[in-house]
Every structure is written in C-alpha cells, then in structure tokens.
C-alpha cells in the first residue's frame, strides 16, 4: 500500500500462470467468468501502474532452461545429468536440505518470477527511461515458498534491491480485492500491458504438473531440428500420477524424461536414480501435488483437491492460444535482440541464472 501511494514509485505487478485458474474461487465467481483479464481489471482498480504476465518470463525460462538442457545433453559424458528443473523453490529447498550432493543437477535457470523481476528492473526500466530504483515489483503467486525465494539475498542481480520486492499469494490478492471494495461481478475484461504481457500457451501450462517439461521439449525440439513439432507431441508427460516417465525422439536422439509432483514422490524418484533402477536425462519436480495449480497460496476448498481441475483450465488456454511455442513469443524475441543477445549469453547468465548453493536457508 505504501508503494501504491508513493508517486515516486512505479508499481509493476506480474500474475503467475496458475493464479488465473483459481483467483475467483473464494470471491464467488465462476471459473468461466474469472478470466485473467478480469483480474487485470481488478488490479488496475487497486492502483498498479503496469500489469504484466508471468507467462512472458515463463517463455523466457524455457529459452534459458531448454538451451541449458541441450548443452548438457550434448556433453552428457561430462555434464551433470539428469538435469532437474529449478523453478519450484519448495523443491530447491528440499534438494538443498535432503540431497545436497545433487544440487549441481539443478538447472541454473531462475524461476519465471525471478527472471521477471530482473527484467523489470533492467530492460523494462530502460524502455521506460527511468532509474531502476523507482520500479517496485510485486508478484502474485499460487505459492507461499515464492516469498522465501524472493527474499534470498542473492536475488538482486538487477542492482536495485531485491529483484522482486513483494510476493502476494492468490488468497492474499482475493483479500486485497475485497479490502478495496471491488465487486468482481461487475469487472470488464482488460488487456495486459505491453511488452511483458505477451505470452505463449507453453508459458501458461507452467502452472500444471508436467507443464514445464512439455513446454521445454516443444522448444528444445525446435532448437535441434529447426522446425516446430506438433504442439501436443509431448503430452505424455501430462497426467494425475505422482511420478510419470516417458521417452521422446529429439532429432534422432532418445531423451528420457520424468515428471513428479509432491515431495514424497520426489524422494522415491531420487532414490530410484541413486540406486540405479531409474535413468533419466531431464526431470521436472514440483513440491505440491498437481504442481503450482495446487499451490499452498491458492484458495482452499474443504475436502476437495482442485489442482487437476485448475490444470484443465490451463491446458484449455494453451489450446486456444495463437502462440504455442515459447521461442515464437515476439516480446521474448525482441528482449533478446534489444537486450539479452541470446540464451545463455553473458548478460543472460548474470540476470537470469543463479547458483542454488548460495541460497541461504531460513
């Protein structure tokens, strides 16, 4: 509230993929009516200056993480494999405390939340022509662990304080909407601001278990084959099982992948890798059963597990999106051309990657 009232501050807010499938549940509006564009309208009424989509930085994450996986896979005799996804801070913390010898298997790519913060306070500040210290970055997340991640002391690569200043959960945003006496039933749909409001269907499925893997494989295929696969070619990684595995052909090379959600399943998977009964190249793990759609910051329905219902909303949004591939997001392409140069460039490494060994635990 202080930042919203401070005229010297430019308040920028990002909305995570899974939030759009759940924000209306505790406000008494149907999932069909509670579109992300109505949430954008509510946040404008609250007073945010610019409203962006974390799906933009999910696409950016895919470009970095997918490129990193291909580098490791090419050099697999010497590289740390399997490569684990790194966008779930609950999972990263679990590895650090339970399996510290496997931290090097984590992708160094930051999560979409943290990539967004770094880009907002560098590239976007540059586009606005303002000092980065004026940008106050808020994220709306389905996850309580994102508060920990935003506060990790090394997460300030943009050089203007923490890259993400405040994290609000979906439940907290619902309370904010109520506190501002905004009637959700009367909201009209409004568009995200540009250019960090453009995203692909691959970005939106980050909110479902298996979504990060599927999005990464879509772009990895393009990067090695030079052409797009069928957008649904990798949908075998979808499903309700807590631990799923599949193998795919990437331009003649067999890639073995696994997806797990829930830390009990993560533990079983890691133990199987350790004792040699399972062998993978790329593994996605989310701490919450069902992935971010079932995150700890989402609305709670007594006796109901809604993660998979919410995931179906996200897959539906992917299906109707004109963009199905992260590498085709025009705003991501422009961000590389004007600022980052290319995936895994020196600037990309500085702003979009992290060493999880340096994360303090508290």
Tell where the protein language model's regions lie, with residue ranges:
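Iron-sulfur-associated redox domains of electron-transfer enzymes in respiratory
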Residues: 1-362
């Amino acid at each position: 509230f202080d930042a919203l009232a401070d005229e010297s501050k430019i308040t920028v807010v990002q909305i995570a993929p899974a939030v759009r499938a759940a924000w209306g549940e505790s406000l008494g509006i149907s999932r069909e009516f509670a579109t992300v564009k109505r949430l954008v309208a509510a946040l404008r009424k609250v007073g945010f200056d610019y409203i962006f989509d974390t799906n933009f930085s999910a696409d950016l994450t895919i470009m970095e993480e997918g490129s990193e996986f291909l580098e490791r896979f090419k050099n697999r005799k010497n590289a740390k494999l399997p490569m684990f996804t790194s966008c779930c801070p609950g999972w990263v913390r679990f590895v650090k405390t339970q399996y510290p010898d496997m931290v090097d298997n984590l992708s160094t790519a930051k999560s979409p939340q943290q990539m967004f913060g770094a880009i907002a306070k560098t590239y976007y500040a540059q586009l606005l022509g303002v000092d980065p210290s004026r940008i106050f970055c808020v994220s709306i997340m389905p996850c309580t662990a994102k508060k920990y991640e935003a506060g990790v002391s090394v997460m300030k690569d943009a050089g203007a304080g923490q890259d993400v200043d405040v994290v609000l959960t979906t439940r907290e945003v619902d309370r904010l909407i109520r506190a501002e006496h905004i009637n959700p039933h009367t909201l009209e749909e409004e568009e995200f601001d540009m250019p960090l409001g453009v995203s692909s269907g691959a970005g939106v499925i980050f909110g479902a278990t298996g979504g990060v893997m599927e999005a990464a494989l879509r772009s990895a295929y393009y990067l090695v084959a030079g052409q797009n696969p069928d957008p649904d070619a990798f949908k075998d990684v979808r499903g309700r099982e807590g631990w799923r595995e599949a193998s795919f052909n990437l331009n003649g090379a067999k890639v073995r992948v696994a997806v797990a959600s829930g830390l009990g399943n993560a533990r079983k998977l890691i133990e199987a890798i350790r004792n040699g009964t399972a062998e993978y190249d790329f593994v996605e793990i989310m701490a919450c059963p069902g992935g971010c759609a079932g995150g700890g910051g989402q609305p709670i329905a007594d006796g109901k597990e809604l993660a998979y219902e919410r995931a179906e909303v996200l897959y539906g949004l992917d299906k109707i999106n004109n963009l199905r591939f992260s590498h085709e997001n025009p705003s991501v392409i422009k961000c590389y051309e004007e600022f980052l140069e290319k995936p895994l460039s020196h600037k990309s490494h500085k702003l979009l990657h992290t060493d999880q060994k340096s994360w303090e635990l508290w």
